[in-house]
Amino acid sequence: MDLAKQISVVDSSLQDVTRNITRPLANFHPNVWGDRFLLNNSDQVQLKMNALDKEEAIEKLKEGVRRKLKEASNDYMRLIQMVDAIQRLGFAYHFEEEIDQALQCLFERHHEYCKDNHDLYANSLSFRLLRQQGYRVSCEIFEKFKDVKGNFMLPNNGEVMGVLEFYEATHLRVHGEDLLDHDFVLSREYLESVLPSLTNPLAEQVDHALHQHSNRRGLSRLEARHYMPVYEQYASHDQYLLKLAKLDFNMLQSLHKEELSELSRWWKGIDVARNLPYARDRIVETYFWILGVYFEPEYAAARKILVKVQSLFSIIDDTFDAYGTFEELQIFTQALERWSISCLDQLPDYMKLIYKTVLEVYDEIEEEMIKQGTSYRTAYGIEAIKSLTRNYFMEAEWREKKYTPTTDEHMRLALKTCGYTSLIIISFLGMGEVVKREAFDWVLSEPDFVKASLTINRLVDDIVGHEDEQKRNHVVSSVECYVQESKTSREDAVYELNSRVESTWKDLNEGFLKPTKFPSPLLYRVLNYSRVIEVMYTKGDWYTNVGPEMQDYIRQLLIDPVNVE
């Protein structure tokens, strides 16, 4: 029996009328892409051929880059600029070992190099690259840029690049670095004031840093796509690096298109638009989201698992928020706890498709885990979805009772219902040998590093989505809790919560500094989820409302190749 063809919300809507049921529908707009990403066999063959054509050229260019890194090893400034270019251009994943060695060498020489060096650009770039890599370098190197009154000495307009690099560096600050807190604001104001007088490519860089995302908080693929044409405009650019960046970007795009086509075919089988029309039909946006978590070829299996599970989490979230009655949600939660196909007959018709699909996807995950020799991970994945659903139901109980919790009470539950603890667990499942059992237990214990990511993700989501959500029967957000508890205005509440987000980024930065309990590939999954939120939610909920800017981002990564000529 094909449940996707036989079960539909439409079938139950007539029953709702006769039973006088009112549902909290959100009226999400439909999928904006249609079947655009569904490739036929000839398209897939062509993508594979295009990727193979690039591989040989890429390998030759990679050897050349290794030589260049070796040649630059004794020249501090040349080496940090080369590492910076490689990272910004988006192909650093090919050179992780070489970059680790280079930055270890730079760290050993950093203090001596910066001690009497009054070049703001050089000091800032060195600080940022080392902090990004987890090195505990001191911000005291910037004391020499203060006047006798302790104020940051702003340079003349000829040194804008130095201030821009310093502004980027301040995004790596941690708690207690008051110097960087103050000068983060000052450097931003300075860049805003000089931007109208700048010309490209510097104007493009400054505008991007101010109005898009800092290097620390942006998505690697988008940042690379933006930086390539900027880098090319500088006379000092390295043609070797630029060509490798373009070829590698296009090769990855071909791989990602193949993956998205396969996932789109799976999603089409569920037929959300027909069978679950109350839910967000967002497989393309989900895939974009997961590219922000990991884009590298080695994580292809992990990526497919995470896209499928996150898509199902989205449907379950919408079922709890925008369709299910309290009684239906209770039955669904109990069925997930039992985790058995025998529960199918107890569920409302429209929920049967969701439940059956969850079990099928988890059967696939179990097969993959057995193949990888990591079958113990499946239990963590199952508990992740059970735990999330339990917390969704607790939220539904609050909504049913029209209960307004305190801000702290709300945050304790909201950090769980945002789903990111569960998603981080799922993101680890297919990552291979780098993940040990202890890593799952670490995430579940919600250490400060993980909690910081959850807090950022929850607050940013609440800030941009609270007004739309409160138009229907929806549980209160952080904004409403803060307004009621502090007896303040909505605007003041949003300002305060944004300040908390900025402060919590310091906790994330601190958690990345060495020594760390777990290897950086695991830490990056946690960090990258917050980066995605910064990109997709800071200006609005672009997952729910897929407007022109979000569509443009998707075109850049998944439709339009980079011009290599």
Curated annotation (Swiss-Prot):
Catalytic activity reads: (2E,6E)-farnesyl diphosphate = bicyclogermacrene + diphosphate
Biological process (GO), any one: diterpenoid biosynthetic process
Q: What class of enzyme is it?
A: lyase
Chain location of the short sequence motif DDXXD motif per the record: 317-321
What GO MF terms are annotated? magnesium ion binding; sesquiterpene synthase activity
What pathway is this protein said to act in by its record? Answer: Secondary metabolite biosynthesis; terpenoid biosynthesis
Q: Which UniProt keywords apply?
A: Lyase, Magnesium, Metal-binding
What does the record's cofactor remark say about binding? Binds 3 Mg(2+) ions per subunit.
Which EC numbers does the record give?
Answer: 4.2.3.100
What positions does the entry give for Mg(2+) 1 binding? 317, 321
| Co-factor(s) | Mg(2+)
Binding of Mg(2+) 2 occurs at 317, 321
- The entry marks the following residues as binding Mg(2+) 3, namely 461, 469
Pfam families given for it? Terpene_synth (PF01397), Terpene_synth_C (PF03936)
* Protein function: Sesquiterpene synthase converting farnesyl diphosphate to bicyclogermacrene as the major product.
Q: What is known of its domains?
A: The Asp-Asp-Xaa-Xaa-Asp/Glu (DDXXD/E) motif is important for the catalytic activity, presumably through binding to Mg(2+).
Q: Which family does it belong to?
A: Belongs to the terpene synthase family.
| Protein known as | Bicyclogermacrene synthase
Q: Species name for this entry?
A: Phyla dulcis (Aztec sweet herb)
